[in-house]
């Protein structure tokens, strides 16, 4: 059962979200992927990343980022709805999430990052949770959310991705953000399991991180 919550119009989502999502889609679309005898039904949605429309949207959101102008959840949901048509949608969403987390990490000062690297693992986890709380405040839209610890986890009710994608593939975006953020702060590779999915009938969306072997 898919969620029926509608995306709101109040600007409360960072423009980094739609910008990185579009840039990731563009980067995954390369001319050398188009082979003779290709299945047009599959390849046409992929070519959207190289279209003039997408390039114009990327330019638009770059300007929005410069101006630090928050976006409405409805705007982001519209873009998510465009990406979920693609056969590689889950890959795009997860990679976009990783890039958002990497950007947030790199925006911290060099001194801060070096200090975090020297902290014991428990303190690193707490720092990761604090950073996640700050970041998801700008990514969750109108959804209610919380970030847990031991392990670092995320729970969102009424998430943008569940609203936009009844299939649940878009939820890979939040998995990518959470896993990469914890990876950067702890210095240990993490993945995120989507334990519950609101779009697939769960009462909420929940992601749990774990260290990769």
Regions found by a protein language model. Give the residues of each.
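N-terminal accessory segment detector
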Residues: 1-153, 160-169, 201-204, 213
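Long, hydrophobic, amphipathic alpha-helical segments used as structural scaffolds
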Residues: 143, 147, 185-189, 193
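Non-catalytic recognition/regulatory regions in large multidomain proteins
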Residues: 155-157, 177, 198
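Active-site helix/loop of acyl-thioester processing domains in fatty-acid/polyketide metabolism
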Residues: 172-187
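Beta-rich nucleic-acid/ligand-interaction surfaces
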Residues: 192-211
């Amino acid at each position: 059962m898919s969620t029926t919550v509608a995306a709101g119009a109040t600007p409360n989502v960072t423009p980094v979200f739609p910008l990185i999502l579009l840039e990731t889609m563009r980067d995954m679309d390369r001319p050398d992927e188009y082979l003779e005898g290709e299945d047009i039904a599959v390849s046409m949605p992929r070519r959207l990343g190289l279209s003039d429309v997408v390039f114009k949207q990327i330019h638009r959101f770059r300007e929005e980022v410069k101006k630090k102008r928050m976006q409405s959840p409805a705007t982001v949901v519209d873009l998510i709805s465009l990406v979920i048509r693609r056969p590689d949608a889950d890959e795009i969403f997860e990679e976009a999430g990783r890039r958002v987390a990497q950007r947030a990490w790199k925006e911290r000062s060099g001194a801060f990052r070096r200090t975090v690297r020297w902290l014991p693992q428990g303190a690193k986890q707490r720092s990761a949770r604090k950073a996640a709380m700050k970041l998801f405040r700008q990514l969750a839209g109108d959804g209610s959310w919380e970030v847990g610890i031991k392990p670092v986890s995320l729970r969102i009710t009424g998430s943008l991705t569940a609203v936009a994608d009844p299939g649940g593939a878009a939820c890979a975006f939040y998995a990518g953000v959470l896993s990469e953020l914890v990876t950067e702060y702890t210095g240990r590779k993490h993945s995120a399991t989507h334990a519950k999915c609101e779009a697939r009938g769960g009462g909420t969306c929940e992601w749990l991180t774990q260290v990769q072997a």
